[in-house]
């Protein structure tokens, strides 16, 4: 499966905070690293401190941990 920037994907990595959520592919690295796909989400995770809306809204995944929901418009 070849993912491209802008594709909507569902997360299949069970230990991920975003398991089952849908995110947008921000970039796909071609250099051969283990987790080449950066996915951006609408909400942040649990990182941050009390009273703050800060946190992380991106994560790296392998292509086999992602399911294509909607291809990006061309």
Curated annotation (Swiss-Prot):
Presence of the UniProt keyword Membrane in the record: yes
Annotated disulfide bonds: none
Example of a GO biological process term: photosynthesis
Could you list the residue ranges that cross the membrane? none
Q: GO CC terms on record?
A: photosystem I reaction center; plasma membrane-derived thylakoid membrane
- Entry superkingdom: Bacteria
Task: Tell me which InterPro entries the record gives.
Answer: Elect_transpt_acc-like_dom_sf, PSI_PsaE
Report keywords, A-Z: Membrane, Photosynthesis, Photosystem I, Thylakoid
**Membrane association type:** Peripheral membrane protein
Q: Does the keyword Oxidoreductase apply?
A: no
Query: Where does it localize?
Result: Cellular thylakoid membrane
Reported function: Stabilizes the interaction between PsaC and the PSI core, assists the docking of the ferredoxin to PSI and interacts with ferredoxin-NADP oxidoreductase.
**What family name appears in the similarity comment?**
Belongs to the PsaE family.
Q: What is this protein called?
A: Photosystem I reaction center subunit IV
């Amino acid at each position: 499966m070849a993912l491209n920037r802008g594709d909507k994907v569902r997360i299949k990595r069970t230990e991920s905070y975003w398991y089952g959520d849908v995110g947008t592919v921000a970039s796909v690295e071609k250099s051969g690293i283990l987790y080449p796909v950066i996915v951006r989400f609408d909400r942040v995770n649990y990182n941050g401190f009390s009273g703050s809306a800060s946190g992380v809204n991106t994560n790296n995944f392998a292509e086999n941990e992602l399911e294509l929901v909607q291809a990006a418009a061309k």
